[in-house]
Design a protein with these regions (language model features):
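Acidic, surface-exposed loops and disordered segments
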Residues: 2-225
Length: 225
């Protein structure tokens, strides 16, 4: 009996992992506050270094998010370069394999979409993917690398919780590249760095949402000795 229950739980988790993918355009349907709270509550079960739980979470919805979106569109329209609190670095800072994967991703997007779709792909980023809610994850300034690791686990837990509750998501640098706009509209203090944004909502029927990026073969990343 225990074995059957255990296998059932594992299969459910695998299904959630397989279902989660980056949704690049959302419907206007709102995500209820109760659902948002439940998503974050589940993510709070994530582990951290000596239970430090270094994360803080801010969610923009409604008029607040629309004010952010309007300012975002204006900055993008002026081609203002992003200046995120956590420097993303240059592509050359990534490993050769990482650089190849990123190049392959952009090439695949170009082949997947026609010119009109590709233009929409770029446009929806600048309007925050049309999302009705954006989660912003922060860390105290002078955070350690372990805290970044912990926050990554928290973010993944949050997206898996969202998936399990029927809510789609996408984590993106685009969502945090103008931190001054976020601080103008959210109670994020200067002694916290805005590390990542995760858009939440319900996926639209746009063609771009059909794209799913491939994963490396297991033997390319795994060594068992």
């Amino acid at each position: 009996m225990w074995f059957k229950v255990f296998v059932g739980d594992i299969m459910k988790f695998i299904e959630v992992m397989e279902k989660r993918h980056s949704s690049r355009d959302f419907k206007k349907d709102e995500v209820s506050e109760d659902t948002l709270r439940e998503i974050v509550k589940i993510a709070c079960m994530s582990p951290s270094w000596e239970n430090s739980q270094p994360w803080n979470v801010y969610i923009a919805t409604g008029e607040t998010l629309e004010a952010i979106r309007e300012a975002w569109i204006a900055e993008n329209g002026k081609k203002i370069k992003g200046s995120a609190d956590m420097n993303p670095g240059h592509r050359t800072n990534f490993s050769e394999r990482g650089q190849k994967n990123m190049a392959d991703f952009m090439d695949a997007i170009g082949k997947f979409d026609d010119d009109e779709d590709l233009e929409n792909f770029n446009h929806v980023q600048h309007i925050l993917f049309n999302s009705p809610a954006v989660v912003y994850l922060t860390l105290p300034k002078n955070y350690t690398k372990w805290s970044v690791y912990d926050l990554g686990g928290f973010g993944m837990g949050l997206m898996l919780a969202a998936t399990d509750l029927g809510v789609d998501s996408i984590p993106a640098y685009e969502l945090v590249k103008y931190p001054y706009i976020l601080r103008d509209n959210l109670p994020i203090p200067e002694d916290e760095d805005i590390i990542m944004g995760i858009a939440l909502g319900y996926e639209s029927d746009e063609h771009i949402n059909e794209y799913e990026s491939p994963r490396l073969d297991l033997d390319e990343i795994l060594k068992i000795n």
